[in-house]
Amino acid sequence: MNFKNHHQKKRFGQHWLVNNLILEKIKEVAELEEKDFILEIGPGRGALTSKLLDSKISRLHAIELDEDLIDLLNNKFRNDKNFSLQQGDILSTNLDSINKKITKVIANIPYNITGPILDIFVGRLGIISKNNYNKIIFLMQKDVVDRILAKDGNTNAGAMSVRMQLISNIRRICDVPPSSFDPPPKVFSTLVVFEPLRPEMRLDIKLEKYLDKLLRISFNSRRKMIRNTLNSILSAEEIEKLSESSQICFNSRPQDISINKWIKLAEACIKITNKNQ
């Protein structure tokens, strides 16, 4: 069996990147160095893998779910001592043995596992990761990136926007048309870079946890005014005091509140709750 005889499996969300310009762009933004230990998720036919291995790096470790591709990939890169391959599902694979070595994560993400992948590699509010990733480069569904980068007042703004922007620096590199893939997906993709914030640059862990809860409650009822969503965690009296002392308009809807104001609101909620205990 060879790559030409391998048929993509729809259940794995396989859309292989075939646009050489985008492959080169991913390599360029990765800014690879000799010390880099790269984790590539879903190498597929190995087109991007080949580009990355052309650079001097310490190691490229790839994880591929499709068992039919394992022998093909091992054969393709059999002469490259910096390449290693593991068969498995990235959502359940134990990375403990290599996690502290990994410096960069690169992937063309299957659309159906975008959320869990972001949680694992970019991180979550209220959880300080022990990973050493300095750069995460993902090719993702465009509308997800639009939501992640949305600012207050934008209809795309949501809990994901606030969470992701609070734990990482994010750069949109370029949009990628369906024709860049085999087979072409139905939607555009976007190449995006996440640079996770170091622990010392993050908010206080207790504040992050409270803010995460506040975002979940608020955006679950995004059509409601903040005044009406807070009643599940604060009394009517507390909400009234908060609205009088806060710089936030409590008649605003969640998507209209800036990240800085979300932080101030969480701080104020914690303060008033502690005072009344």
UniProtKB/Swiss-Prot annotation:
Classification via InterPro entries: KsgA/Erm (IPR001737), rRNA_Ade_diMease-like_C (IPR023165), rRNA_Ade_Mease_Trfase_CS (IPR020596), rRNA_Ade_methylase_Trfase_N (IPR020598), rRNA_adenine_dimethylase (IPR011530), SAM-dependent_MTases_sf (IPR029063)
Record keywords: Cytoplasm, Methyltransferase, RNA-binding, rRNA processing, S-adenosyl-L-methionine, Transferase
Coiled-coil annotated spans: none
EC number: 2.1.1.182
Entry binding sites for S-adenosyl-L-methionine: 15, 17, 42, 64, 89, 108
Catalytic activity reported: adenosine(1518)/adenosine(1519) in 16S rRNA + 4 S-adenosyl-L-methionine = N(6)-dimethyladenosine(1518)/N(6)-dimethyladenosine(1519) in 16S rRNA + 4 S-adenosyl-L-homocysteine + 4 H(+)
CDD domains: AdoMet_MTases (cd02440)
Keyword Nucleotidyltransferase among record annotations: no
Cited SMART domains: rADc
Recorded family membership: Belongs to the class I-like SAM-binding methyltransferase superfamily. rRNA adenine N(6)-methyltransferase family. RsmA subfamily.
Function, as annotated: Specifically dimethylates two adjacent adenosines (A1518 and A1519) in the loop of a conserved hairpin near the 3'-end of 16S rRNA in the 30S particle. May play a critical role in biogenesis of 30S subunits.
PANTHER family: DIMETHYLADENOSINE TRANSFERASE (PTHR11727), DIMETHYLADENOSINE TRANSFERASE-RELATED (PTHR11727:SF7)
Protein name: Ribosomal RNA small subunit methyltransferase A
